[in-house]
């Protein structure tokens, strides 16, 4: 009896705690201040980056300062951009190897789990590259090709319902059902790796219960192969001495990889800023603007996008369908890694503020305009902190705010940006 009373007491406490915890969770989801703070932090970071560029652009730079700034660009090209894309290529290959050409009767949970782990590794590296989308990623439309969202589930269902086991190049052209987000849908549900049983039978997602897992595996194989080619394209586009095997894959796929004006690499292009016969950047300042503060494809560009689109569209504007990475629950991680891409560029290495690079914007501003530099660095740290403080998962946060289930949210068409 005593034991029963003790257990009952524990049960009562557990129920009370569970209810209290559930209430607290709901209250947090209903609290708009978290999203507002994250958007405000991104706005401050964008402003700080613009101020930093203006400080350089308006300065009467000495020759020593110009040399240091060029060294910073060289460091960013080699140690941030090329290295990020190389590691991204490695992770994409890992994902491809995990799934391979396995059929539904051959695949194991280990295959799925390994593919999911490689997906998250690749996803982190891709999000860590979004501060430097200016260049190959935008010139060759690689960014929209491998990272368009929301996923067009209706169109994807049409493809999968056709029962195809292979896909032509022409059929792999609609970016709304390709890249990371198509793979995310196939590999993850409700923030969890999918169970192998689904791939051996039928999907369980609303509207997809007539789709066989083996059909999804065949489609995933085609999408991964396409993704691998395009991340290789990013890598060899920036390398002055490209990896021979990856270059061959890019050439075999008929993909572009050189700057049109000079037929040189994008790394070479950045390193020769100011030499109009060797670079698309007529001045050193123009190259720095592209890295730090252009409205698109720069550090400021991705800070703006995170605050005014990735967070604002679903959270502030009510377009719940616009949540990025909703199936893996990776949204907040994606947003924070976007800001970390800015951090890597600013500090000149893959480890953010711990990079200790020989040349970096961090060191340049510490020596020449410390208040401006500190403003950027504080804004980076604050943006990451405010983003990571938002209720997890972001898709549930937005769904609660607007009382709309993600799977029921209708796609909203946005005008294409010029």
List each model region and its residues.
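Short, intrinsically disordered low-complexity segments
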Residues: 1-2, 31
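Sec-dependent signal peptide recognition
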Residues: 2-9
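Acidic/proline-rich low-complexity IDRs
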Residues: 9-10, 44
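N-terminal or membrane-proximal amphipathic helix/coiled-coil initiation segments that transition from
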Residues: 10-13, 93
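C-terminal motif of bacterial Sec signal peptides marking the signal peptidase cleavage site
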Residues: 15-18
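Bacterial signal peptide processing site
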Residues: 20-23
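Mature extracytoplasmic or organellar-lumen-exposed domains after removal of signal/transit peptides
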Residues: 25-418
